[in-house]
Amino acid sequence: MPYKIALIGTGGRSLSYAAAYQKRDDISITTLADPNASHRYTMAKRAGLTDDYAEYDDWRDMLREQTALDGAVICSPNHLHAEHAIGYLERGLPVALEKPLAPTKIACENIIDAERSNDGRTLIGFVMRSAPFYTKIQELITRGLIGRIVSIQADELPGVGVSSVMNRSPWRRYRDKSGGSILEKSSRNLDF
């Protein structure tokens, strides 16, 4: 029996999860939540979902009504991560979140508290950890092949792709919603 997964936030990032899950027999996207019906429709179509999935405008309705879920993948804007994650963690479900965990220290602490008090599990999507370029750098550092690291310069060179993401997702431009450019774009450099 496949794990039943809910997707909260059905914008562009969620499509990557859907594509990965389509290749697996042990995971099934059974529920979508997003206030944007067009996003839900696009996600369902691209994920190849049939009529046997549920969709919701409000994630709270989904949390209340969908009692057989095995986990939640949260692809909502950063400022909503804490609210979404805490709801699912308090129900005892594991959650996967896109980076960053949340845009503020207190929101991060609240997620961690919910995880600890409910014996929960949280995965943060730092996908660059497995990118060949970064794994090679990590290997060179770990093996000591480039000497002692005393300084790192990590330049984020935005191209057309980054510009289109910012235009498509205008919330990313506002620090109170995204956490600012260090959390939104450069957190992967800090993670490394």
Can you name each region flagged by the protein language model?
Residues 11, 17, 53-114:
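Beta-loop-alpha module in the N-terminal Rossmann-like domain of NAD(P)-dependent dehydrogenases
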Residues 31, 70-71, 151:
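Short, Asp-centered acidic motifs that coordinate Mg2+ and/or phosphate
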Residues 24, 47, 65-66, 131:
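Acidic-histidine catalytic/liganding microenvironments
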Residues 110-127, 148-152:
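Rossmann-fold dehydrogenase core element
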Residues 128-192:
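Predominantly a Rossmann-like dinucleotide-binding segment in NAD(P)-dependent oxidoreductases
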Residues 1-50:
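N-terminal Rossmann-like dinucleotide-binding module
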Residues 80, 100, 123-130:
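Rossmann-like NAD(P)(H) cofactor-binding subdomain of soluble oxidoreductases
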